From Swiss-Prot:
It comes from the Bacteria. It comes from Lachnoclostridium phytofermentans (strain ATCC 700394 / DSM 18823 / ISDg). Peptide chain release factor 1 directs the termination of translation in response to the peptide chain termination codons UAG and UAA. One of its GO terms (cellular component) is cytoplasm. The gene is prfA. NCBIfam families: prfA, PRK00591.1. The keyword Cytoplasm applies. Pfam families: PCRF, RF-1. The modification N5-methylglutamine is found at Q233. Keywords: Cytoplasm, Methylation, Protein biosynthesis. Its main location: cytoplasm. Belongs to the prokaryotic/mitochondrial release factor family. It is found in: Cytoplasm. Methylated by PrmC. Methylation increases the termination efficiency of RF1. This is Peptide chain release factor 1.
């Protein structure tokens, strides 16, 4: 581990030397690449320098204890030694986490698909509530939401909603949300007061750029139809809605949220790129999982990941056995505790894998 850290420190110093040369800005592409690499390495290099300084403090305290006879000075050295040793353990753990491989998609925007599953109207109502939950969380993170498609059930529920969340690090925070979300409560339509269980499927996909996915437009078929739902005066009077079919995979995407056919077409292509990119990521994940211990969940949208029990005010994430009795807060978008716990569990699993390799 420390050989790797020393290599990173040397590389960081090389970059700084290059950036200090007066001619560095002559090649703007090279300059931007160096600046990005410096930013990427900055945090781990700073932490490694802190580690080295703390080790030096320990050595100096030990030397002082060997040489010093004054009791007051010896007590100060003992305190400094104890503090430095405790700090060293913490810094070493922080370095291990910083050395974990970065997910190249973490900084990306996300496309979110929420669909009602088992439970009919009750599932659709809960799908709408999950949309509100993620919208509230996005609001606290100062992210922007862009609706792509909405299929309502007539009583305030969503059979399906597709939307994009634009914001730095959106995928890093929301990537653990993919899977089946189960709700247990008494539906408003239940006259007998019985608790029902319904399910909603959530898919979180990183936005795919054109460079991420090779898309042959000859493989795409576009059909237009009249919008049904919100959309202003153009609803049901113009063929502005778009249905995109990707013939090699059979993926079908409908977008009708915009009044413009062209905008709906662009949104459908964004969703298609994200789904094709997700298929590639799933293949890579399956290959990696065959060689490594499982991390936090499988990322499979068919995996049951969480239960929201309204009579008990309880939310349980089954992957990490986390139970919270702050259900109302969670449904109002206060997801940070859950997200932080999932991130920590994922990091712990990756650390275990890394230690097996050393």
């Amino acid at each position: 581990m420390f050989d790797k850290l020393e290599d990173l420190l040397i590389r960081f110093q090389e970059i700084q030397n290059e950036l200090n040369e007066p001619t560095v800005t002559n090649d703007q592409a090279r300059f931007r690449k160096l600046m990005k690499e410096q930013n990427d390495l900055g945090e781990i290099v700073d932490k490694y320098l802190e580690y080295k300084q703390t080790k030096k403090n320990i050595e100096e305290s030990l030397e002082l204890l060997d040489e010093e006879s004054d009791e007051e000075m010896r007590e100060l050295a003992k305190e400094e030694l104890s503090t430095s040793k405790a700090n060293l353990v913490v810094i070493e753990e922080q370095l291990k986490i910083l050395l974990l491989p970065k997910d190249p998609n973490d900084s990306k925007n996300v496309i979110v698909e929420i669909r009602g599953g088992a439970g009919g109207d009750e599932a659709a109502l809960f799908a709408a509530e999950l949309f509100r939950m993620y919208s509230k969380y996005a609001e606290t993170m100062r992210w922007k939401i862009d609706m792509m498609n909405l299929n309502e059930n007539g009583i305030g529920g969503f059979k399906e909603v597709i939307f994009m969340i634009n914001g730095q690090g959106a995928y890093s925070k929301l990537k653990y949300e993919s899977g089946v979300h189960r709700v247990q409560r008494i539906p408003v339509t239940e006259s007998g007061g019985r608790i029902h269980t319904s399910t909603v499927t959530v898919a979180i996909m990183p936005e795919a750029e054109e460079v991420d996915v090779e898309l042959n437009m000859n493989d795409c078929r576009f059909d237009v139809f009249r919008s049904s739902g919100n959309g202003g005066q153009c609803v049901n009077t113009t063929d502005s809605a778009v249905r995109l079919t990707h013939m090699p995979t059979g993926i079908v995407i409908s977008c009708q949220d915009e009044k413009s056919q062209l905008k709906n077409r662009d949104k459908a292509l964004k969703v298609l790129r994200a789904r094709l990119y997700e298929l590639e990521l799933e293949k890579a994940h399956d290959a990696e999982a065959a060689a490594r211990k499982s991390q936090v969940g499988t990322g499979d949208r068919s995996e049951k990941i969480r239960t929201y029990n309204f009579p008990q005010g309880r939310c349980t994430d089954h992957r990490i056995k986390l139970t919270s009795h702050r259900l109302d807060d969670i449904m109002n978008g206060d997801l940070q505790e859950v997200i932080d716990s999932l991130t920590a569990a994922d990091q712990a699993a990756k650390l275990s894998n890394m230690q097996d390799e050393y």
